């Protein structure tokens, strides 16, 4: 009779719920064996569910594949709302029918998985572009226009250039066909890939800024207006990376000028 360890090793090779190996092993009454069978079945079901989820997130891409297009770029940004730091956009072209396990809207990915999935996108993407627009430009042109500039910069870095743009809820003034998708980072794998690239890139930048400007907790809050960030603003004032067109930074700058 096989040991439970041997059965566990055998079950790792089973990829289908209908496998005859399950039928054979279910005759074994040992609780340890039944536990391993249940565990493996749950793992297979989870893989099937994940594959279906990824498949559903390729619906926009598949429509474009039918039209003969393959160089499809997903575009997304991170950093519209913070009081400090740049807005970062990423543009990612994935291979046809590419499925990266765990890839999703970056806001839905556990933080501990960010770097792993970011690396998987880096490894599998045909091309990646990153656009970074700093706080000074944001203050000059407004955050909406700065976001478009970041996206255009990211697209300009791609090689080869894309045949179609999938963009999260925006339209760009570019001579390339495009589709604007509401909640695109949750509905398109290409946009989700751009979402995680932009997120990790910006988070790493804000960690560097945390070293340059301690006291604002940038490494944790990424420039968003948390209690610690606002406390830092009150105690230490405005840094060169703060957006002076955003409140309460704007009022702090005006108050300093008036005094």
Curated annotation (Swiss-Prot):
Catalytic activity: Endonucleolytic cleavage to 5'-phosphomonoester
Localization per record: Cytoplasm
Record: residues binding a divalent metal cation: 76-77, 168
Any one of the GO BP annotations: mismatch repair
Cofactors: Mn(2+); Mg(2+)
Known EC number: 3.1.26.4
Enzyme's top EC category: hydrolase
GO MF entries: manganese ion binding; RNA binding; RNA-DNA hybrid ribonuclease activity
This protein's UniProt keywords: Cytoplasm, Endonuclease, Hydrolase, Manganese, Metal-binding, Nuclease
SUPFAM superfamilies listed in its UniProt record: Ribonuclease H-like
CC terms in the record's Gene Ontology section: cytoplasm; ribonuclease H2 complex
Residue ranges of domain RNase H type-2 in the record: 70-258
Source domain of life: Bacteria
One Pfam family, short name: RNase_HII
InterPro entries in UniProt: RNase_HII (IPR022898), RNase_HII/HIII (IPR001352), RNase_HII/HIII_dom (IPR024567), RNaseH-like_sf (IPR012337), RNaseH_sf (IPR036397)
Cofactor binding, note field: Manganese or magnesium. Binds 1 divalent metal ion per monomer in the absence of substrate. May bind a second metal ion after substrate binding.
Family per similarity comment: Belongs to the RNase HII family.
NCBIfam families for the chain: PRK00015.1-1, PRK00015.1-3
Function statement: Endonuclease that specifically degrades the RNA of RNA-DNA hybrids.
Protein name: Ribonuclease HII
Species this chain originates from: Streptococcus pneumoniae serotype 2 (strain D39 / NCTC 7466)
């Amino acid at each position: 009779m096989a040991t439970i360890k041997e059965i566990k090793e055998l079950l790792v090779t089973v990829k289908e719920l209908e496998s005859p190996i399950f039928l054979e092993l279910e005759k074994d009454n040992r609780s340890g064996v039944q536990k391993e069978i249940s565990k493996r079945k749950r793992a297979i079901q989870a893989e099937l569910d994940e594959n279906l989820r990824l498949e559903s997130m390729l619906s926009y891409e598949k429509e474009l594949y039918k039209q003969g297009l393959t160089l499809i770029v997903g575009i997304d940004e991170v950093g519209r709302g913070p009081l400090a730091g740049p807005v970062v956009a990423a543009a990612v072209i994935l291979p046809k029918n590419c499925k990266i396990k765990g890839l999703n809207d970056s806001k839905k990915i556990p933080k501990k998985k960010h770097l792993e999935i970011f690396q998987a996108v880096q490894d599998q993407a045909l091309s990646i572009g990153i656009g970074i627009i700093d706080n000074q430009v944001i203050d000059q042109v407004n955050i909406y226009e700065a976001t478009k500039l970041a996206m255009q910069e990211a697209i300009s870095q791609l090689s080869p250039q894309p045949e179609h743009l999938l963009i999260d809820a925006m339209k760009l003034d570019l001579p390339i066909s495009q589709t604007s998708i509401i909640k695109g980072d949750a509905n398109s794998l290409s946009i989700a890939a751009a979402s995680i690239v932009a997120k990790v890139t910006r988070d790493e930048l804000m960690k560097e800024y945390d070293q340059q400007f301690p006291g604002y907790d940038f490494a944790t809050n990424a420039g968003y207006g948390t209690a610690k960030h606002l406390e830092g603003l009150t105690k230490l004032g405005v840094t060169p990376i703060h957006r002076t067109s955003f409140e309460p930074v704007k009022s702090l700058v005006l108050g300093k000028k008036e005094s």
